[in-house]
Amino acid sequence: MDQIKIAVIGLGYVGLPLARLFSTKYKTVGFDMSQPRVDALMAGHDATFEVSDELLQDAIQNHGFICTTKLEDIKDCNFYVVAVPTPVDVNNRPDLKPLWGASETVGKVISRGDIVVYESTVYPGVTEEECLPVVEKVSGLKFNVDFFAGYSPERINPGDKEHTVEKIKKVTSGSTLEVADIVDGVYNSILVNGTHKAPSIKVAEASKIIENSQRDVNIAFMNELAKIFNAMGIDTNDVIEAASSKWNFIKLKPGLVGGHCISVDPYYLIQKAQVYGVLPRIMSAARRLNDGMGDYVANQVIKLMNKKGVLVKDAKILLLGITFKENCPDIRNTKIVDIYSTLSEYTENIAVYDPWANAAKVNHEYGIALTDCSLEELRGQFGAVVLGVAHDAFKKEDIRSFLKNENGVIYDVKGMLDREVIDGRL
């Protein structure tokens, strides 16, 4: 390919940072189905805060980066990158509709000699078995004859300002040896820490899904330990610190597993494994355990309130944070909602405060109304406070000041506070 022109399809948490970075080296167009999203980006603001206004405006003004909803704007591109979500349905089965839709989009614009690279997290085989046949059907072109493909799994960590996209080492792959070299070269040209070229697309797909599945299993183990030690009256954090004194101990903390990656991706591999007659018992058990942690936390809070003589049905409870992780507006699959749901079985007096979350989106997605009170207005009102998300904004607060009296309960989900000021934690 003499002159590469890139189109990134999907401008969310993954696609936008990647497209912005590509634009510093190549002519780049960002494509998204949402006109409001495109309008906001072209006005120089990213509501996900993954790309700063300064960097986004620089890309638009100085590097010719544009965002669009129009197919004609990406027809003259020759290197298509698909970065759309891969969710699960209500039964935790892989939902490939976003990928099929993006593949149809590619099929409408791809030309002979072009390359399409998928970044979405999938089970091994999705790119070649599910996506490329759609591109072939819509375009009328033949895969690996008229057009070619690659896979380079995304490794974006929402809200992480240290491990940004340009600093993350990327796995790459291609449908032929020559295409693999081209794909690897394109990514290598924008990354500080380079790439790892996998021998096949399926290997690259598998590498990403086990990254997230491994973390899910490891956290599930820590959550199980937390349940055991809490029942025994032993502080889990103390145990972890002691065990960490050994050089090869993997230091992880218990916690809620939400978001669009770790809590979703294992289901893709679990389903595909069953097609081959393999039942992934460890991954399945990890998913069940982690999915139940919100309910567990809520019940721990109720027990502590009863123990301290706080009448649950009459008390007010404050949930600090609702996003799935700290310092990030992403509310997808947040497990704080599970805490809220279980607590609401005991009392209707629950206030939820989060300086990062969009109140309208929270209400639309979960039917939960965020309080519009300031932190100052919330002080001295509650029988229990659950610190659910470790936003920096909460670290400087006197959390006990939100309690109505000394009998109130502080539960620290994230292990952020000193033990002297809390009544319980994972």
Q: What residues fall within each predicted segment?
A:
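Structural/interface elements that position substrates and couple domains in central-metabolism enzymes
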Residues: 1-426
